[in-house]
Amino acid sequence: MSDVIRLLPDSIANQIAAGEVIQRPASVVKELLENALDAGASIIRLDVREAGRELIRVTDNGKGMSQSDARMAFERHATSKIASFQDLFSLRTMGFRGEALASIAAVAQVELLTRRAEDELGTRLTINGSEVGEVATVTSPQGCILCVKNLFYNVPARRKFLKSNETEFRHILTEYERVALVNPQVAFSIYHSGELVQDLPPSPLKKRILDVFGKRMEKDLIPIGIKSPITNISGFVGRPDGARKRGALQYFFVNGRFMRHPYFHKAVMAAYEAIIPQGTMPNYFLYFDLEPSQIDVNIHPTKTEIKFSDEQAIFKLIGVVIREALSSSNAVPAIDFDRKELIDIPAYQGPGKNVVRPPVDLDPSYNPFKETGLTEPIRSSRRQSPDMGWNELFKQFEAKRDAEKMAEPPIRSEGLFASTDFTPSAVSATPSTDMLCYVHRGRYLVTTLSRGLALVDFHRAHKRILYDRFMADESRRHIEQQQLLFPELLEFNPSDASAVKAAVDELQSVGFDLSPLGVSSYSLLAAPVQIIDCAADVVRDVIHTTLEDGRSSHEQMLELIATQIAEYQAIPCGKTPTAEEASDLLAELFASNDSTYTPDGKLIVSIIEEADIARRFE
């Protein structure tokens, strides 16, 4: 039998390696931007076409490469960053494995134009699927221009699984922003299909954050800083009142590299505990600077997972620096005691003053135990109140209360739910007043079914009802619009402009009036009358959810808008409904096509079977 183990060709090996390093166009952008930074570039331009499918081009003014280096750069494990294993523990560069360019060249058509400052002419190199094409000497500006065309052209399965252009471009913007935020001294610009999306000049860190995410954040940023033998921490954290339910801006950077660290995120959240509303997230931009020997970045090909030698100490340090920053900036309100009712106590005058005993009236002949005859009845020591007719008033109150009880619907009956097994078809949509309904802890309704007891979360039930009403009104185009007394300014991330515009177009179709004020700013002029008081919050939540989930179709957007409107308009938890409100709510809920779950998938009704109830008393 012949041997079956063989060595794979370099082209196939590179395509396999590319599966780990190059997952989508954003992966290419990340690697090329980091290479430009490692080359010492101070100006970097990123051009993208068709969300990176057709073209990704990075132009920089870095050191450039010689012709031999340009050819060697596309070989696997070829790098200028390390020469020995010990160099891994003193890394200050972004790349070091020598895998990125080889992986990119394996799944795309690559063209490189480069020149060093000391060379008169540069080099032009083309590679198609790991196959080197033309290598020529040409005129070229200093630095590098690296073009990646037709990504995954030779791996159709990978190209087929790419998302929509909007989604892929958002991933590109995310990588671009991460690199820009940690290198404020470098000028960045990004173009999509020839149109300028964002231009970032060199600037201080705070201005770079504002340039990326909008000037609206200026009042939200609180500077932090601490130096210790373990690590130096700097950056900004958000004010508690700027915490968001969705779309919080949360970034960790270590030694100029973006990272994800769930453990450190817990430290941040612990510092904000009890000072931000439950379910919200604070903004933060934390930069760690420590010796490279104290971290290990060689864990994952994307280098976003990093291990620290003393994570527990850094965890505590994060909590200390954030709490100190919040306290010193008055972001956490201090206790202010009212001094009006304080007793005026004179200050102690010192030992030189004689202490005088205050005069006290004393009867030395008084004996509390002396027996005396009772000459008159003992009177109560309590003060006697004049007869104000309280008894008569109480009787009138009881009579009035009895009359009100007679006017109320009976609370016990076998009417509405006696013959139903929790199916909408068996329930009349007409509100019934003949039912058993009990409110538990101001949130849950307890009612009867033929199968047993139903526990209903009335806040969620109201959400389902409002959602159904909105969808029915939208289908009939009966949404009533109301003008805001004062238009409200809404600002979004400039890099999300295209996705925001798509969401705004859908909002316009369901009763919102949003007027553009620039690339990523809008003025909210009108909204559906039901949510006029919280219209701006609804718009923000809809857009942030769209950016996170990538919803784009009309049906998806409509469902999202209806869900957010129902969330804000529903009866808040803790507000007890009246008997009539509870009856109407239950009747309309069970008439719904889906009375079991809210639009976002949360349980509304839990049933305790009759058999389970009987079993408890056995």
Swiss-Prot record:
Kindly list the GO CC terms recorded for this protein.
Answer: mismatch repair complex
Query: Which Gene3D superfamilies does this entry report, sorted A to Z?
Result: 3.30.230.10, Histidine kinase-like ATPase, C-terminal domain, MutL, C-terminal domain, dimerisation subdomain, MutL, C-terminal domain, regulatory subdomain
Q: Offer an example of a GO molecular function term for this protein.
A: ATP-dependent DNA damage sensor activity
Q: Biological process GO terms, please? A: mismatch repair
Q: Which UniProt keywords apply?
A: DNA damage, DNA repair
Which SMART domains does the entry mention? DNA_mis_repair, MutL_C
Check the record and name the CDD domains matching this protein. Answer: HATPase_MutL-MLH-PMS-like (cd16926), MutL_Trans (cd00782)
Pfam families listed in its UniProt record: DNA_mis_repair, HATPase_c_3, MutL_C
UniProt family annotation:
Belongs to the DNA mismatch repair MutL/HexB family.
Protein task: This protein is involved in the repair of mismatches in DNA. It is required for dam-dependent methyl-directed DNA mismatch repair. May act as a 'molecular matchmaker', a protein that promotes the formation of a stable complex between two or more DNA-binding proteins in an ATP-dependent manner without itself being part of a final effector complex.
PANTHER family, per database record: DNA MISMATCH REPAIR PROTEIN MLH, PMS, MUTL, DNA MISMATCH REPAIR PROTEIN MLH1
Protein name according to UniProt: DNA mismatch repair protein MutL
What species was this sequence derived from? Porphyromonas gingivalis (strain ATCC 33277 / DSM 20709 / CIP 103683 / JCM 12257 / NCTC 11834 / 2561)
Tell me the organism's taxonomic lineage: Bacteria, Pseudomonadati, Bacteroidota, Bacteroidia, Bacteroidales
